[in-house]
From Swiss-Prot:
<dbReference type="GO" id="GO:0090729">
    <property type="term" value="F:toxin activity"/>
</dbReference>
<keyword id="KW-0800">Toxin</keyword>
<keyword id="KW-1015">Disulfide bond</keyword>
<protein>
    <recommendedName>
        <fullName>U-scoloptoxin(13)-Sm1a</fullName>
    </recommendedName>
</protein>
<keyword id="KW-0732">Signal</keyword>
<comment type="similarity">
    <text>Belongs to the scoloptoxin-13 family.</text>
</comment>
<feature type="signal peptide">
    <location>
        <begin position="1"/>
        <end position="22"/>
    </location>
</feature>
<dbReference type="GO" id="GO:0005576">
    <property type="term" value="C:extracellular region"/>
</dbReference>
<keyword id="KW-0964">Secreted</keyword>
Length: 76
């Protein structure tokens, strides 16, 4: 009985301290990589209504009030 309690305690300590990591983290990272591959890089043309710039960038440089504005900006 003591052996079962000790093994259960050891397992719980490993899970709580991160020695045994959850598989969900791996799934999130693959999802993140998929987004990174499909995002628009710096100085790439983007649409201000559908911002798809890579993380850390914003779709900037549009002026909706200007007559020559086409609605396309650059990821900066």
């Amino acid at each position: 009985m003591a052996y079962i309690c000790a093994x259960t305690l050891a397992f719980l300590l490993c899970v709580n301290t991160g020695i045994i990591q959850a598989e969900d983290k791996e799934y999130v990272s693959s999802e993140h990589m998929e987004f990174r591959e499909s995002c628009i890089p710096q100085d790439g043309e983007c649409d201000r209504m559908a911002d798809a710039c890579c993380p850390g960038l914003q779709c900037l440089g549009c002026n909706p009030l200007a007559a020559h504005d086409t609605g396309h900006c650059k990821c900066q």
